[in-house]
Every structure is written in structure tokens, then in C-alpha cells.
Amino acid sequence: MNSTTRLVVLVLPIALASGCATPRPAPTPTAIATTPSPPPAVAIPLAPPSSPRPPVVAPPSTTSDAAPLADAEPAWILDLGRALLARGEMMAATAVLREALRLNPDLAEARASLGLALYAMGDLDAAVEELRGLLRVRPDLREARLTLAAALVARQDWPAARAELETALAASPDLLQAQYTLGVVRYAQGDLTGAIEAYRRVLAREPRAVDARYNLALVLKLARRDAEATPAFLAAAEAGLPRAQYFAGAAYATGAGVPRDLVAAIAWWTRAAEQGVAPAEEGLAQLRQSASGRARRPPADRQAVEQAFGEYRARLWNDYPDLARQGDEPLGAALLRQGRAREAVPVLIREAAALSEPAQRMLETLYDQGIEGQLPAHDERILTYLKSAAAEGRSRPRP
């Protein structure tokens, strides 16, 4: 198993996690919005759940999958339908599975597979109808119940989904995916305490379930339990979740659940911004505005931010103990001296974004001239940075 476990029925349905909404802007040193707002609706992707997915079954030998089915045994047709389902050929699988059921309406495995195929196609009403009918006569079919629950969640029928999940968990308490999805459903119903309980049960059995830890942190944040939320955000951030890195930075920027530390805030926001989290970039931009005096903050705030950016730049050297610094040169310059242009460019961008004027000038020169044999002129990474810097008034505009 990997160092972190990802639960895949639902991908972080809370709006901040899925990108459906963004938090309020984050970034003066004294006032940073860190409380996520519950979305009016939860966007959930229509992806087949992990546990009910059928095994890959090769159909019995035949000249073609499209061979006539009229004379075939229902069990053979079921195997063919499952094989098509495993290959992602949902329309064909649906037709084949319906034929199996025409020949043998009591073939429970075919009806369960048909429900999964319909769900994967996005035909939620038909999937729910098939699976409910099946479970009325075969309530023991756990995978069919989990598929039904997933379809109900996708349809945002929270009470019905909750009932199916709780039934499944009563029979099999070790179903981590069902427990995780129950947390999603309870959150959607406004039951924050129940959602917290569900996510904690997942983590008690699988501490590496990083999505569950992040969702737990979000719900704790909504419940105004910062002292519990921040450690969960930090754990998810350290596991590599970009949105968690944003919230970790926000916690350090405001002192929510941890001592206030602008250097740590800058470090976490930088990591999140490099992975496309817009609120993190907004937070850094507002800190830069504060340091420049444009944000009309008190002089003490401006000085604190300037010092934090300087300390952040100094700590970047800790990752390169083999490099000897010459004077006040940027870390990126030292890397360039060693012919390590590939490493130098992202480091220079970090340093320039942290208000290093020498790094900024080096990037402008590198963009215009490049380095023969190492870095061509007009590097796209540098251009992207220079455009963002120009938008903040820290660089001349580029075409």
C-alpha cells in the first residue's frame, strides 16, 4: 500500500476541496479569512465506486463479443457483460446484461452489474430502480448496496443514501469506503458532529487515508474547532494535498490552532500556489502588497512581513547544504554557477516571489537571454512568473 491511502468513491465533496468555491481572500497579516463556507449544493463526480467494481472477467472463447446471444447460456452472457463493464464499454455491457436478465430474471449478479453499468453511465434513476429491486429480494448483496448508496449520493438524495450506508455498515463495520461516504452525506445534511465521527472512524482504521483527514479538518473548521482542525490540516498538507497546504498556511498566518508564524505561512502558501491553488497565491500577493506599503498596513506589520519573506528565502538554503553562498547572492544564482539551470529557475521564481530583487533581475535576464547549452531564452515558466509579477507592479509588462 502507498504511504497515503486515497478513498475514491467521492473526491472531497466540500466546495473548497473540489474547487466548486473558494474561500474569502486570505492575506493581510492581521486579517486572513480561513473559515470555509458550506456550499449550497455538493458537486459529486459520477465515477464508479471502488468496492463494487466487478473483476476483470474474460468471456468464454468466441469469435466475437458481438456473436449472437440467443442460444447462449445466461451465465456465459453474464461473463461477457462483466468483461465489457470492466473494459469501460458501458452501453454494450448494459445491452448484454439486459439479455442475461431476459433469459434469467432471477440472476442477481447480472442485475447488480447492470445497476453498476447504469450508474457509471450517469443514468442514476435507472440504476437506483434496478438496485432497489434487487436488494428487496437479496438484501445480503453488499456490493449492490454500496453501488446504490453511491448513486443516491450522486443524485444528492442524502437521507436515502445515509440509510443505505448505515445498513451496509451495520452488517460490515470495516467498510472504510462506506464510512468515508457516510461522512460526506452527514456533512451534506448539516450533521457536522456525525461527519466528524465518520471521518475519525475511517482514520482509526486507516491513518493514511489522507482525503478523510482533510475532510475531517474542513468539518472541524466549520465547527469552529480550530485547535483540532489545524493538526489535521497540517497532516494532510505534509501528505501533499495542495488545498490542505493552503489551510495550513492560513492557520499559521492567523495563529488559528498554532502559534502565529508568517514564515511557515509563506512556505505552505508557496507550496500550494505552485500546485495551482488560487487562494494561496492571493494570500502571498496580499502579503507582498503589505510589505510594499500598498496595503496601508501599520509600519510594524510591513516590517514583520518583510522579515518573514527574508527568513523564508534564507531557509531555502537549508535544502542545499552542498552549496556555498557568496555574499548575498540568491540561492538560484549559486545553482546557476554550478550549471544547474533546471533547478535554478524554480528556485529563482520562489525567491523573486518572496521579494528578492536580485532574483527578479536574474529572471528577467534569463528570460531575455537564456544560457547557452542550459536554458533557452523565453522560458515559459519564467514568462508566467513575470506576467504575474507585472500584474502586481513588480515587473515590466511582457507580451
Where do the model's predicted regions map?
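Hydrophobic face of amphipathic alpha-helices that form TPR/SEL1-like repeat modules
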Residues: 83, 117-118, 151-152, 185-186, ...
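TPR alpha-solenoid repeat register
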Residues: 76, 110, 144, 178, ...
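Alpha-helical segment of the N-proximal tetratricopeptide repeat
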Residues: 70-103, 116, 120, 150, ...
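Short helix-capping/linker turns of helical repeat alpha-solenoids
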Residues: 72, 106, 140, 174, ...
